[in-house]
């Protein structure tokens, strides 16, 4: 018995010594965890946005924000592992102590007396305390404390780090945090049952004894990996395709609507930055804002879905940042940078020429797709090469902004102010440009196919006075009611475009291609159309007084009811052109009505943005002054009558017109601008010039329904084909006795 007692006392001493050391370690672990909870809890969305260093409490040390969220969980995990390791060693000693105690003292009363000599450390008392104390309140509280500090708190802290950092959107850090959470769960499964039961790590009891523990572990794993995701993350994209309900659950917890009053998200957490109504310009910078190149750098940041409505970010640098789905409504973004920079990758921005020496890598450009910048203040901002597809810029203030080579396909710029802006080579296909103010803007070589300018009607027309649209791609664009006085559209591609009731007084459309376009009742007084391609265009009721038609191609065009007084230059081709008999040569203003002319002229000039454009337009429309004599190059009524006489009539007209329409709408692949044939075909249906084929209209319709034999048929929509069938039916009714 003495030998057993001596051995027990040695084990008891070892247990107490170990308990004292583990207690110190445990307290240090709790303090460290609490320290991290406070540090992480102090991180705000503003700090994440500005990458503000984290100031550690007490130590007064600043740590880099990203570095902190990478290193802190790892250090904590190592500390956690070491603490579990020491607890397991203590647990093994306690198991040995219990076995030795039972052998040395068979009597329960003696064992109870010996147990009172153990260290009061909560964990020791739970594993080796007196039996009478174990069911008591003290024991229950001790178990709660140990479970919270060694199971709940560590997992909570690691999850807190992940959730707090999630809006920053850095996949490698988030995945590192997920791995650390999984590692913590593995450590728990390896050590905690062994610690609780005093076994080896490999001798864990069956899973059925830990159902709640297992369920909670699965829940934590599922939450960390599948629920706590952020917009644009690769995993989230996969889940959206294969398991949409998981994404819905994630949105419910992390992506709720934002309270416009408090500026806080309504969801429990947030996976995007929410910083409404905040200023990001330091007071010292505010005083010298004009002298600064930039106020804050956000280059290359992932800011997808960020809510920055009404934020003050003047002169901020977003070069190469990802702002897809972000909200910057009414934000102050004057002179902000949303452009491109080289990243060393070879891929270039779509739309850039391969021959250019300076290629902007697509991954080095700012992405602002499907974002909202409604009513944002963007005067002088730069969006060169930016990806703005589907973005809302309605009512945005973009005066003097640069959007050269910007990708704006499907974007909405309704009521936007773009006076003096540069949109050279911008991609604006199918964009909504209702009531946009483009006065003095430059849209050279801009791509505007099927863009919509006329949705605002005559009350809210798009304004292009004095704008430069040279070489612009405006095929199929809807420009009805647009104000284009003094605009330059040299070599512009306007096949199938709708310019009905458009104001083009004094505009320059030299060598523009308007085949199949609709210019019904357009105001073209004094416009220059030298070498313009107007084959198959409809200019019914157009005001062409004083227009310059030198070498203009008007084959198959309609000038029915058009006003042709003092038209100048001689059109090159007038075959199949529809002309009134007699020609409408009514003066715009009668002689001795110079006061009316001057008032009309002054109203036009007042809409132009600069003196240069005013001088140019004034010179072009001065030919309409009733007090001036006819110009020397006037196209007289006799000239128009001669052209009408040369045009075939009756059956010959229908046959030749049919061949002309088919050739125009079904340009061969080798023909110039054959890629624009679908726009021409659409335009001929829309402006109804196609009905000039008369009884041969079904033949034309048959051609337009054969994409293999007619390139123009490729782009025809279901609505176009329905309209074509309607025209054929209409023609059949006319010819049926």
Regions found by a protein language model. Give the residues of each.
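Intrinsic low-complexity/IDR segments
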Residues: 2-54, 63, 68-70, 75-737
């Amino acid at each position: 018995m003495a030998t057993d007692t001596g051995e027990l006392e040695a084990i008891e001493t070892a247990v107490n010594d170990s308990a004292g050391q583990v207690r110190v370690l445990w307290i240090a672990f709790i303090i460290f965890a609490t320290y991290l909870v406070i540090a992480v809890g102090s991180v705000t969305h503003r700090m994440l946005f500005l990458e503000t260093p984290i100031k550690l409490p007490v130590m007064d040390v600043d740590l880099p924000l990203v570095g902190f969220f990478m290193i802190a969980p790892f250090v904590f995990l190592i500390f956690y592992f070491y603490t579990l390791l020491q607890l397991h060693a203590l647990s093994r000693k306690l198991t040995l102590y219990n076995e030795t105690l039972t052998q040395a003292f068979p009597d329960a009363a003696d064992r109870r007396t010996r147990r009172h000599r153990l260290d009061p450390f909560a964990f020791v008392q739970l594993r080796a305390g007196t039996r009478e104390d174990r069911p008591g309140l003290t024991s229950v509280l001790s178990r709660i404390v140990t479970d919270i500090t060694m199971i709940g708190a560590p997992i909570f802290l690691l999850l807190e780090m992940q959730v707090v950092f999630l809006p920053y959107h850095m996949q490698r850090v988030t995945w590192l945090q997920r791995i650390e959470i999984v590692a913590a769960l593995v450590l728990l499964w390896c050590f905690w049952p062994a610690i609780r039961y005093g076994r080896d790590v490999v001798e864990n009891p069956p899973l059925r004894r830990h159902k709640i523990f297992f369920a909670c572990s699965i829940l934590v794993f599922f939450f960390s990996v599948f629920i706590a995701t952020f917009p644009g993350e690769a995993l989230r994209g996969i889940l959206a395709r294969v398991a949409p309900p998981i994404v819905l659950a994630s949105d419910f917890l992390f992506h709720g609507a934002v309270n416009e009053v408090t500026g806080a998200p309504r969801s429990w957490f947030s996976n995007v930055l929410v910083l409404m109504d905040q200023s990001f310009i330091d007071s010292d910078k505010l005083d010298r804002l004009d002298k600064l190149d930039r106020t804050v750098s956000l280059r290359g940041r992932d800011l997808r879905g960020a809510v920055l409505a009404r934020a003050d970010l003047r002169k901020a640098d977003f070069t190469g940042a990802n702002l897809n789905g972000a909200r910057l409504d009414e934000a102050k973004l004057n002179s902000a940078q949303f452009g491109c920079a080289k990243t060393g990758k070879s891929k270039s921005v779509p739309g850039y020429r391969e021959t250019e020496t300076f290629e902007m890598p697509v991954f080095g450009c700012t992405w602002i797709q499907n974002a909202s910048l409604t009513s944002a203040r963007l005067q002088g901002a730069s969006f060169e090469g930016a990806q703005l597809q589907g973005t809302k810029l309605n009512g945005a203030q973009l005066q003097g902004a640069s959007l050269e080579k910007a990708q704006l396909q499907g974007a909405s710029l309704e009521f936007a102010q773009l006076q003096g802006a540069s949109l050279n080579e911008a991609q604006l296909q199918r964009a909504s440009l209702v009531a946009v103010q483009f006065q003095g803007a430059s849209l050279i070589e801009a791509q505007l196919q099927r863009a919509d300018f006329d949705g605002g009607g005559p009350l809210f027309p798009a304004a292009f006075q004095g704008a430069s649209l040279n070489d612009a791609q405006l095929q199929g664009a809807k420009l009805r009611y647009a104000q284009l006085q003094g605009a330059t559209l040299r070599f512009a591609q306007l096949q199938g475009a709708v310019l009905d009731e458009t104001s083009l007084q004094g505009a320059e459309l030299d060598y523009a291609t308007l085949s199949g376009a609709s210019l019904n009742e357009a105001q073209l007084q004094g416009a220059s159309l030298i070498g313009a391609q107007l084959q198959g265009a409809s200019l019914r009721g157009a005001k062409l007084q004083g227009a310059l038609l030198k070498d203009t191609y008007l084959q198959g065009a309609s000038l029915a009811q058009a006003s042709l007084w003092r038209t100048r230059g001689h059109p090159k081709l007038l075959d199949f052109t529809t002309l009134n008999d007699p020609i409408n040569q009514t003066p715009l203003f009668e002689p001795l009505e110079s006061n009316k002319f001057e008032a009309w002229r002054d109203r036009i000039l007042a809409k132009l943005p600069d003196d240069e454009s005013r001088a140019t337009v004034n010179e072009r429309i001065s030919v309409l002054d009733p007090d001036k004599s006819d110009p020397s190059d006037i196209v007289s009524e006799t000239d128009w009558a001669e052209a009408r006489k040369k045009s075939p009539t009756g059956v010959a007209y229908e046959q030749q017109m049919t061949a002309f329409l088919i050739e125009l709408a079904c340009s061969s692949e080798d023909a110039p601008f054959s890629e624009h044939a679908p726009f021409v075909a659409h335009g001929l249906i829309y402006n109804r010039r196609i009905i000039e084929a008369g009884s041969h209209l079904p033949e034309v319709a048959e051609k337009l329904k054969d994409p293999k034999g007619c390139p123009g048929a490729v782009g025809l929509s279901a609505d176009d084909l329905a309209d074509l069938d309607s025209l054929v039916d209409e023609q059949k009714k006319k010819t049926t006795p």
